[in-house]
Amino acid sequence: MIDFKLYAITDRRLCKPKLIQDYVASLLDTGVRAIQLREKDLSDTELRSVAVPINHICKAYSAKLFINSNIGVATDVGVDGVHLPESLLDTIQKAKARNLLVGCSVHDLDVAQKMQVAGANFVTYSPIYPTMSKPNPAVGLKSLRRIVGALDIPVFALGGITPSKVPECLNSGAFGVAAMSSVMSYETGIDQAKNYLKQIEEY
C-alpha cells in the first residue's frame, strides 16, 4: 500500500558530516514516511551495512524503506520495497515474487504504461522542472497530467520541485512528490522536508 505523499531519496554525500542513518532519523522526525536508499556507488556488502540500521529506524517510525535497484540486498535486509530504473523493467516480477513493493523511475508515457502492466506499485515521473541533477529536458505539468490520466497507479512528481511548487503538482494529479537534493542538504534539508510536508498537508 502506498500511503505516503513525500518520497525522500538519499544521497549520503549531501548530508555530511552527519551519518546517513542519523540524517534519515532526523527526516523521519519531521514526518517523512518513505525513504529511497539510493547509494548506487556502494558494493552489496557496503549497501547492506548501511541499509540494516536505516531499516531498523524506518520500522521504528512505521516508515517504508525502498532500496534502489538492488533486489538481493532489499530481500536480505527485509525492507519494504525496491525502486527500479527503466532499464530493470524485466526484474519487476522478480521483486514482486519476493513480496517487495516496487517503485519505478519513468520519463515518458510508453515506459510508464509498461511499468504498470509489469506490476509496479507506483512511479516517479521526472524531471517536472529544470534541475541540475536530471540531464533530461523538463517535461512540465501538462505532461504530468497526461501521465497521471493514463495510469491507475500513483505518480510521484520529481525533479526541480521546491515546496512552493507542491500545490501545482498535486493539482495536476500527482499522488505526491519526491525530492533528493533539497531534503538531503545537511544545512537546510530538514527544514525543507518540513516545508514539503506543510504544503502537502495544507493542499
Residue ranges and their predicted role:
Residues 1-89, 94-122, 146, 152-153, ...:
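Conserved N-terminal beta1-alpha1 strand-loop-helix module at the mouth
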Residues 134-140, 145-147:
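Substrate-recognition "cap/lid" segment bordering the active-site pocket of phosphatases
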